[in-house]
Amino acid sequence: MQTVYRVYEGAREPHRLAVARTAEVLGRGGLALIPTETVYGVAVAVNAFSDAVPQDTSEFPSWPRDPQAAVNGAAVPALGTGYRRIFTLKQRELTQTVAWLVDGVEALDRYGVDIPEEARVLARRCWPGALTIVIKAAPCVPTFMRAADDTVALRASASPVVQALIRACGSPLACTSANTHGAPSPASFAAVEGRILEGVDVAVDAGETPCRDASTIVSFQHGGLQILRQGALPASEI
């Protein structure tokens, strides 16, 4: 790990240098440790590994593929890339895909298809916030970033740091909790495992997270709302 930037998570405008430098690393395909309002996560910029969001390919070269690995029949980024290090650090399978942090409700139709109106209503009510919504993936979502049932999980985070990074990168962030698979998710910078901190390219320290719990996950894939994981957002508020 190269650099740690310390910011005040409660500030409306996170430290500009921290955002700019972290976004620069993400744009190059690097891996960042970032605070959200729920727990700390490890994240990459989606546009560094896909065509879902256009990028200047003269500045950011195409990412290397791994000919020995595939998800849903599609090539995945090579070992050592930011995306693959998510799975190496967490010690989890490539098929356990990563949710996207997005800029708002419009992202449902940008990165999904056949969106139920109930999902839009729920997103308008609960976003930005601690709710992840699983939807059918649009063609622009890379095959290797989709779950086996052709879905992608989206969340608009209330964290000013996350919001600023999404704007600076011009891209969603593929982000998952910064922990060994099966271990508790870190709700503070101090709780992040040392080996994970050492395995990222840049880190943002905002102290403790406001929610101190992972997001609640819901799906509309089987004819109605299903709660897949109970998290920081109570079922009574869904």
Language-model region placement:
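Active-site-adjacent structural elements in enzyme catalytic cores
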Residues: M1-I238
